[in-house]
Amino acid sequence: MSEKPPKIRSTCDACQAAKLRCSRDKPRCRRCQNLNKECVYSVSRPLGRPRRAPAEEARTDDSTQGEGDMRTRESSFEANGSSGNIPSPHLSASPTNIMVHDDPCKSLVWDDALDTDGPMDFGSTLSDFDTSMILDPVPDLITHATSSSTDLAASSWGTDSSIATLPTSSQALDTKSKSTMNLDKSAPPESLSLPMPTPPLSFEGTSMLISPPNETEIFPFLQSSFESPLSNFAAPTSAPTELSSLRSNSLDYGCNCYTTVLRRMHQFSLTSLKGGLSTIDETMRLEKEIRGEVITILHCSSCTANRQRVLLFVGIIMETTVDMLEHVLLDDTAASGQSIFDQLSSSPQSHRSKRTRTLSPLPYGEKTTLRLGTYEIDGEEKAGFLSFMIRSRLKELSTTMRHLHTAIQQAQQTSNSKAATTIIVEAFQRLHSLMRRLDG
């Protein structure tokens, strides 16, 4: 005959707090059995049994009276038998202190040490709860937590009248919609810390260091309605003089490098709309200013706070400069019947061979006027002077691009640095192809 497992006796917390003896084969609350826990009064755990009562001669009159009250309650529990965890009606008012614990095995602790006939006071019943459970900014979490507390109270006390005494019912619930357990959204609590909306990124060098660069964020105010190397830029959203007001005050960088470069390019784009795009003097002046600003950016500690994105931005500026030089120095639209933008989209080899075969000479006479004081230089003298000036500028631009490429290689290799390397290498190859074309 197999040995029977020990039966789960009465709950340890209730019996041990009241110092009652185990009812042996008649469990009282069956809390241990419902929670699938082993009762401390089991045969396998003899050390968890309650302590014996003191000697009869050491008892006082008060302790004798208290023992009689406990025996009366024990008899009432035995009369209930296996009626579950619902206490008898005459004992529901006697517990005066209900402690809520985090341990599911100790959800409620009945303290019979304080017997009073007054109403139950739940002022300290929820002392272990965190305030965020009561004033939670998420309505679903409040509804879930409040409904769970209500179910716990109803299952433990056997009555719904105690819900009105919970602190959550008067602080976090609306009395008109208590059945739906929703919050009053018209007046949120002052203690809630609502998330602040993210401010829009303004056009500034510091904002580019935060968000990934793209055409609409880097060039938000450049025209795109004309056919030129600047056609990839977006339309202007504000006047160039208002760029200083768009600076973010949240970051202390104090740098105007990006703003200066893009304002100058915007001014050049406005000039291009009026028919002055093909002038060599304007293009050379813009190239010199941009090259100087690029050198300033490379030596600026504020601009290089996020070096990878800065180098990517500078690479885009240098590529745009090469586009402008190709467009103004190699006017091949009439000779080849194909615009420079279509040729730039082809492969580098076919692009180089097409330029070698079909490009016309530099349009010196039609594009600009060269004056020395009041004397106008024309003909071959003008062509030789402009060729020398343009070659010198392109060599200086090539030196700047070498410095930029060295800075990219020394920076940490990320996706931005790899993209900057690709852009600057392609622009450098196109620049040297242009220099070879000018040399003849």
From Swiss-Prot:
A single cellular component GO annotation: nucleus
| Compositionally skewed regions (Basic and acidic residues) per UniProt | 53-76
Q: What is the lineage of its organism?
A: Eukaryota, Fungi
Tell me if Nucleus is a UniProt keyword of this record.
Answer: yes
Q: Which organism is it from?
A: Fungal sp. (strain ATCC 74256)
Question: Could you tell me which Gene3D superfamilies the record lists for this protein?
Answer: Zn(2)-C6 fungal-type DNA-binding domain (4.10.240.10)
Keyword annotations from UniProtKB, A to Z: DNA-binding, Metal-binding, Nucleus, Transcription, Transcription regulation, Zinc
The entry's DNA-binding region feature spans 12-39
**Where in the cell?**
Nucleus
**Protein name per its UniProtKB record:** Transcription factor phiO
Source organism's superkingdom? Eukaryota
Q: What does this protein do?
A: Transcription factor; part of the gene cluster that mediates the biosynthesis of the antihypercholesterolemic agents phomoidrides which are dimeric anhydrides. Probably regulates the expression of the genes from the cluster.
Q: Which CDD domains match?
A: GAL4
* Polar residues composition-biased segments: 77-93, 168-183
Q: To what use is this protein put? A: Phomoidrides A and B (also known as CP-225,917 and CP-263,114) are potent inhibitors of Ras farnesyltransferase and squalene synthase. CP-225,917 and CP-263,114 inhibit Ras farnesyl transferase from rat brain with IC(50) values of 6 uM and 20 uoM, respectively. CP-225,917 inhibits squalene synthase with an IC(50) value of 43 uM and CP-263,114 with an IC(50) of 160 uM.
Q: Which residue ranges are recorded for the region named Disordered? A: 44-93, 168-196
Q: Does the keyword Nucleus apply?
A: yes
Q: Name one GO molecular function term.
A: zinc ion binding
